[in-house]
């Protein structure tokens, strides 16, 4: 098993969310609105792990349902 730090994991999850979001043709605003937020700040900051912001499991569950992607896909390196 790889030696993965929490920071590395959070960054990879953010990159994977961004990849699948773009594949589905959604903007950060589109995804934010679908998640119930009125601003892109949650998605934009967490996709790049800005100031330590990261997606929590509830975010990932919502995103997987919106994007129709298995939640496990977000954890792949």
Regions found by a protein language model. Give the residues of each.
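Recognition helix of helix-turn-helix/homeodomain-like DNA-binding domains
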Residues: 37-53
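Short, basic-rich loop-to-helix N-cap that marks the start of a DNA-contacting helix
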Residues: 49-65
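A short, Lys/Arg-rich alpha-helix, primarily the initiator
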Residues: 1-23
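Helix-turn-helix DNA-binding elements, focusing on the entry/boundary residues of the two helices
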Residues: 17, 28, 57-60
